[in-house]
Amino acid sequence: MGIRQGARSHHLSTGAAILEGADTAVAFTEYESVRHRLPAPRAPMAPVRAEHLDAIADHFDVFLLDAFGVLNIGERAIPGVVDRVNGLRQRGKQVLVVTNAAGYPSSVLHERYRRLGYSFETSDVVSSRMALLKGLSNHAHRKWGLVAAPKFGREELPEGAVFLEDDPAAYAEAEGFLMLGASAWSETRQALLEQALKDNPRELLVGNPDLVAPVESGLSREPGHYAHRLASASGVEPVFYGKPFPAIFDLARERIRPGTPDDRVVMVGDTLHTDILGGSAAGFRTALIQGYGFFDGADPDASIAGCGITPDFILDRP
């Protein structure tokens, strides 16, 4: 997800610190600074420009849609997209949501999409939170320290996990760390976690790799920002579960109709370093939304040239 200065709306951000007045250039620069931890892009090819999803529908059987910038801006569905999604389904297309929302339970996500007018079933939504929770099956049971907001409750969270707040003992006693949302995070807590990892390196699993997210006054710092800082300071390399990393796409692949070739699947999003890079690395085709979200109508050509992450399609709108 992303946003361009001057066209911001409130949305369900799980970030805390706000970069007042920050714009796309700030976010782009920060993503480029952590490219050494991101997947490698495919060899670039010239993208095809089209008007909207209907214009490319004949090429694909499955559409993986990011949420912000594709389905909605803030608490509003993007005009025409509810009908567009319904129309794709009527044409026999499978439509899934693939989102880095990790800070709140699946029930909150589904209620939000319902409120916006979408009719996604539970199996139609794949989140980085789901990917992380599934990934826990590969880890022995332990006492996890949680970077998450207590206000969203304990639904879906592992038994015995402890919310990390201002008590240094909780950081010392945790046997590993889960970063889900940053809305209750602070520089004081970041310093406590950094020191805890230096004193006793432990696993750091990150549900939301986003560095920033849009809010009314600028950009909020998201879990990915804090995770990369922790890695640089402590030497502990995080394990990321959301876009652009493989785990969320592996989970999405389990939901895709059996036998669907990868080149008949398209990842649609507004952000080069998450949606497009991740979809491409997973072997799917990709479509960048130019008219909403990160670019909000600005021409993405300079950014594409600057980072070498090239979508297969550039769409004016979803």
Where are these regions (language model features)?
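Asp-based, Mg2+/Mn2+-dependent phosphohydrolase catalytic module
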Residues: 2-93, 104-126, 130-318
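Conserved phosphate/oxyanion-binding catalytic-loop motifs
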Residues: 101
